[in-house]
């Protein structure tokens, strides 16, 4: 048994089964106040549809801010946002930093490699010390599933926590920006067929997307990938599972491609990247099997020639770069909702 950065033995998500779709540490809904308001954003799982729609509606208001000469609103003026990235992600950290800055917050990016956790201090000791510096909001990315929940349970009452990705478990703001992108282009969730393709087993994005899609009433969600890269429990969520890409893509309105997360794999689950592309890569020919107006999405980073062809990634049906743009507005909305009305 090992001791993790929390200072406790085992994993913060000790009851989680990495091969299953659901995680065992999700007991109750610690994200909501007694009045049903959003205090933390830890997972899309368990969020009422009304809150998800409220976030998307608020994000729509913030999209116009990016087009203004002065790209700032005073919603978080005087608030301190700490970006705590225990796992690297330049793209996600940067968009959170931009979002907080546009809300007029003071932003601190903690250099984890130089922090006390690398000197043996526990995660909770680090959080308690940062809370003593009058932080208002922690944006947390961690390699251990459940770490943001642990922080939310133990941080000071006035502090809010946003999960920026924890292990295989969840990436709620990516899921929300994906939903915003789909709504922007397709409007009505209740008439869509959405395909998620690739390494779903290791993907926190896939889990967040599936919870969001089912919450918003999408009638048909498809999971497409090799048997070795699909978790159990998908069918219980109402997801249709396909082990043939061509069959799975027929008639879909939205395609969400996922990269191979080799850093989370143990053992040889797949042949070479070239063989993977041959069987599972999205090419123009395969895209033609989808609905004529289908859109192509990808949470990034992309591996061209592995899960997606460059002609598709750069083609007219790709909305991948717009996902990045919308992501700033969605993260502004989340931060504004959880921390904007705090005393």
From Swiss-Prot:
UniProt GO molecular function: amino acid binding; aspartate carbamoyltransferase activity
Start-end of Polar residues biased regions: 1-14
One biological process term in Gene Ontology: 'de novo' UMP biosynthetic process
Family, per entry: Belongs to the aspartate/ornithine carbamoyltransferase superfamily. ATCase family.
Catalytic activity: carbamoyl phosphate + L-aspartate = N-carbamoyl-L-aspartate + phosphate + H(+)
Native organism: Burkholderia lata (strain ATCC 17760 / DSM 23089 / LMG 22485 / NCIMB 9086 / R18194 / 383)
UniProt entry keywords in alphabetical sequence: Pyrimidine biosynthesis, Transferase
GO cellular component annotations of the record: cytosol
Job of this protein: Catalyzes the condensation of carbamoyl phosphate and aspartate to form carbamoyl aspartate and inorganic phosphate, the committed step in the de novo pyrimidine nucleotide biosynthesis pathway.
InterPro entries recorded: Asp/Orn_carbamoyltranf_P-bd, Asp/Orn_carbamoylTrfase, Asp/Orn_carbamoylTrfase_sf, Asp_carbamoyltransf, Asp_carbamoyltransf_Asp/Orn-bd
Protein name: Aspartate carbamoyltransferase catalytic subunit
Enzyme Commission identifier(s): 2.1.3.2
Residue ranges of the region described as Disordered: 1-20
Pathway it works in: Pyrimidine metabolism; UMP biosynthesis via de novo pathway; (S)-dihydroorotate from bicarbonate: step 2/3
Ligand binding (carbamoyl phosphate): 91-92, 141, 171, 174, 300-301
Subunit structure: Heterododecamer (2C3:3R2) of six catalytic PyrB chains organized as two trimers (C3), and six regulatory PyrI chains organized as three dimers (R2).
Classification via SUPFAM superfamilies: Aspartate/ornithine carbamoyltransferase (SSF53671)
Positions annotated to bind L-aspartate: 119, 204, 259
